[in-house]
From Swiss-Prot:
Keywords: ATP-binding, Coenzyme A biosynthesis, Cytoplasm, Kinase, Metal-binding, Nucleotide-binding, Potassium, Transferase. GO terms for cellular component: cytoplasm. This is Type III pantothenate kinase. Substrate binds at residues 107-110, 184. It comes from Listeria monocytogenes serovar 1/2a (strain ATCC BAA-679 / EGD-e). Its EC number is 2.7.1.33. InterPro entries: ATPase_NBD, Type_III_PanK. GO terms for molecular function: ATP binding; metal ion binding; pantothenate kinase activity.
Length: 259
């Protein structure tokens, strides 16, 4: 079995694979002050609930966009699983040709998603990840990662509206059936929801235009389902795209299952 860990700005997603099949998955809050022991106890609780043991795990791979948590995360892997994890970063074999100004500055989550989408759905492909930031990545028909766009995420934008506009309340993010709100709350929810639907459709349309191609569009991330159910611009919703990419990268870099 392989343990895959995606450390995002808001949540960490943990998954267990066996023979390329996702058996279990969990989420926990990303807390850069959490110790290796706290991380270990959390993961072991997940395992206990699923009737798994640390000895079941033969390899670990981690993707992280939160550098401060990585020392604790790596220590946790060694202390509780007796495994030194494979870290997604410079030097790892991805199979992607990165045609960008500085390949080292591309977030590991974007690389992982690009690898998974290219393998699973073919190229050309656009990957949209609705996370803390909303990211758009374009991989051309030759499998070359051409770059993309990064926009503020839905949660960030909603909190900014509340924090910077004195008379506007904090609202829950929700799908709105009406673009014309009848109250402050419903107006904010309509603006947030339809604003991001429009942003998604607009950026995808412009990427298709500038690339002069007809890529398949794959969406992932915590809020992807809500947006994609309203938008016809997205072809495929894959909530486990990042975990798939991590498992694939593990196989490409560690074909054996030795500890």
């Amino acid at each position: 079995m392989i343990l895959v860990i995606d450390v995002g700005n808001t949540n960490c997603t943990v998954g267990v694979y066996e023979k390329q099949k996702l058996l279990k998955h969990w989420r926990m809050t990303t807390d850069r002050h959490r110790t290796s022991d706290e991380l270990g106890m959390t993961v072991l609780n997940f395992f206990s609930y699923a009737n798994l043991t640390p000895s079941d795990i033969q390899g670990i791979i981690i993707s992280s966009v939160v550098p401060p948590i990585m020392h604790a995360m790596e220590t946790m892997c060694v202390r509780y699983f007796n495994i030194r994890p494979l870290i997604v970063g410079p030097g790892i074999k991805t199979g992607l040709n990165l045609k960008v100004d500085n390949p080292r500055e591309i977030g590991s989550d974007r690389i992982v998603n690009a690898v998974a989408a290219s393998e699973e759905y073919g190229t050309p492909v656009i990957v949209v990840d609705f996370g803390t930031a909303t990211t758009f990545c374009y991989i051309d028909e030759s499998g070359v990662y051409q770059g993309g766009a990064i926009a503020p995420g839905i949660m960030i934008s909603t909190e900014a509206l509340y924090n910077r506009a004195a008379k506007l309340p904090r609202v829950d993010i929700a799908e709105s059936s009406q673009i014309i709100g009848k109250s402050t709350v419903s107006s904010m929810q309509a603006g947030i929801f339809y604003g991001f639907v429009g942003q998604c459709e607009g950026i995808i349309a412009e990427m298709k235009k500038q690339s002069n191609a007809s890529p398949v569009v794959v969406a992932t991330g915590g809020l992807a389902r809500m947006i994609t159910e309203k938008s016809s611009a997205v072809d495929i919703l894959d909530p486990f795209l990042t975990l798939k990419g991590l498992e694939l990268l593990y196989r490409r870099n560690k074909p054996t299952t030795e500890k």
